[in-house]
């Protein structure tokens, strides 16, 4: 089954990005699901690289890399990145700048869409 996760909340401001990534990882592991994730608004901050979190605390960068490593697709709203001054060099390798047209295509191709 193909899942699309749409993540609007910022990194570490709420646990929604964490829960989205956690569920995506579980679906990949237990059900071999095809995962696409689209981060927009403050959600794009979850894709910043070089995140420094305390030992024992979840790290969204590592979680996102795990989703990507299992062939997950991670897209980031380009307009949202620009509005926050986030340049491509500062995002997780494998996460890609994207557009609303790509989000529309991902939505059309998904069996299920989940929003966080």
Question: Model regions: which residues?
Answer:
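Short glycine-enriched, charge-decorated loop/helix-capping segments at active-site entrances
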Residues: 50-55, 91-93
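C-terminal structural segments of small proteins and small subunits
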Residues: 83-116
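Short, conserved active-site loops that position catalytic residues or coordinate cofactors/metal ions
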Residues: 38-48, 79-80
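Histidine-anchored nucleotide/phosphate-binding helix
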Residues: 17-30, 35-37
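A glycine-rich helix N-cap at a beta->alpha junction
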Residues: 53-80
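Short, glycine-rich nucleotide/cofactor-binding loops
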Residues: 5-18, 47-52
């Amino acid at each position: 089954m193909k899942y699309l996760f749409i993540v609007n909340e910022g990194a570490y401001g709420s646990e929604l990005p964490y829960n989205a990534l956690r569920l995506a990882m579980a679906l990949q592991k237990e059900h071999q699901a095809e995962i696409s994730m689209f981060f927009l608004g403050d959600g794009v901050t979850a894709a910043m690289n070089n995140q420094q979190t305390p030992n024992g605390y979840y790290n969204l960068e590592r979680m996102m890399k795990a989703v990507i490593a299992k062939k997950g697709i991670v897209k980031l709203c380009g307009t949202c990145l620009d509005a926050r001054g986030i340049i491509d060099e500062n995002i997780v390798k494998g996460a890609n700048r994207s557009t609303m047209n790509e989000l529309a295509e991902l939505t059309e191709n998904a069996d299920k869409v989940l929003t966080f």
